[in-house]
Amino acid sequence: MPESLMDIRVEHKAFAGNTVLHGIDLSLQSGEIVSLLGPSGCGKSTLLRIVAGLEQDFRGSVQRIQGEVAFVFQEPRLMPWLTVAQNIGFSDDDRYDRRWVAQLIEEVGLSGFADALPKALSGGMAQRVAIARGLYSHPAVLLLDEPFSAVDAFTRMKLQDLLLQLAARHAITLLLVTHDVDEALYLSDRVLVMGSRPGTITHQLPVGLQTPRDRRDPLLARLKAQALTELQQAHVI
């Protein structure tokens, strides 16, 4: 069995007395891709913030076995006064690893844009920068909160394929929040369905397909029907 990188247990998480997460027990294994699928307000993003260490007011624990954790947000959140290279390297001077940044720029398909400012980038290009920035610290786990929701369908598919290539190349574990059933099934080794508040994991759906996957694969269609059934049974759609 692959080595466990993180063990996440959330017994209880509340905001202003309202319980948003309850009874979460999740382990992330080395090299796997896991998606959290559910409706708005079920606590997916809150769970991701707990895993990242950005939210610490909860009852439970997050045990990180090894490696760093990085976060890619829904919006790229690039600093407008910094170049692409500087945004990736978290610095406005030469203190960042220029060789590593140059490699990441090439890997995400932005060769020639190292000195460009964010205002010169399309939405898809800006999100490529955000992904490269997430990889800069050589993380073992990359957390992504609906990273492709703001781009068009064709760009989304290209970014999904890019993410799979990068995860395989750098042997990174991914934990992804999404509302998109097709995206979850195309990317993931496991899809975790979350129910309405208080949010908890109601079903785990393994995806037994090798990558790269054919989006037209009949098995994906059958898995989508199963995922939608699980969402209906959890009273979330």
UniProtKB/Swiss-Prot annotation:
The complex is composed of two ATP-binding proteins (SsuB), two transmembrane proteins (SsuC) and a solute-binding protein (SsuA). Part of the ABC transporter complex SsuABC involved in aliphatic sulfonates import. Responsible for energy coupling to the transport system. Its main location: membrane. This is Aliphatic sulfonates import ATP-binding protein SsuB 1. Its EC number is 7.6.2.14. PROSITE patterns: ABC_TRANSPORTER_1, ABC_TRANSPORTER_2, SSUB. It is a peripheral membrane protein. It is found in: Cell inner membrane. GO terms for molecular function: ATP binding; ATP hydrolysis activity.
